[in-house]
């Protein structure tokens, strides 16, 4: 007889600093209400993301009915990568009036290549357009 498939009870999406997951909020309460071993998740997440220190790494945690879990790490949010490349703290409050920085097409291509697995795009050109649009909506000029 084949083994039974585990039943999924919850899918939790969090954004946590790489290598710095702790049982404190937001991680503890989100996992605790589903009965997941919080320390075990923190250890596994920190080990999986230690090479990306300094970035915020989104994670999708799948919780099963026997309280076990699996997780998938995603690429850092596009907005964070854009801000890092532009060298600014935050985007513009009025993006179409005040421009806060400028990105080259080479920088946009680099960010698009990083984000491609998580974007809803099949080609690098389409991914570049998505990233460029995000940058423009943050008040960052995209050009040569």
Curated annotation (Swiss-Prot):
GO terms for biological process: translation. It comes from the Bacteria. GO terms for molecular function: large ribosomal subunit rRNA binding; structural constituent of ribosome. Gene3D superfamilies: Ribosomal protein L11, C-terminal domain, Ribosomal protein L11/L12, N-terminal domain. Keywords: Methylation, Ribonucleoprotein, Ribosomal protein, RNA-binding, rRNA-binding. Signal peptide: none annotated. InterPro entries: Ribosomal_uL11, Ribosomal_uL11_bac-typ, Ribosomal_uL11_C, Ribosomal_uL11_C_sf, Ribosomal_uL11_CS, Ribosomal_uL11_N, Ribosomal_uL11_N_sf. One or more lysine residues are methylated. One of its GO terms (cellular component) is cytosolic large ribosomal subunit. PANTHER family: 60S RIBOSOMAL PROTEIN L12, LARGE RIBOSOMAL SUBUNIT PROTEIN UL11M. Part of the ribosomal stalk of the 50S ribosomal subunit. Interacts with L10 and the large rRNA to form the base of the stalk. L10 forms an elongated spine to which L12 dimers bind in a sequential fashion forming a multimeric L10(L12)X complex. Belongs to the universal ribosomal protein uL11 family. Forms part of the ribosomal stalk which helps the ribosome interact with GTP-bound translation factors. NCBIfam families: L11_bact (TIGR01632). HAMAP family: Ribosomal_uL11. This is Large ribosomal subunit protein uL11. It comes from Frankia casuarinae (strain DSM 45818 / CECT 9043 / HFP020203 / CcI3).
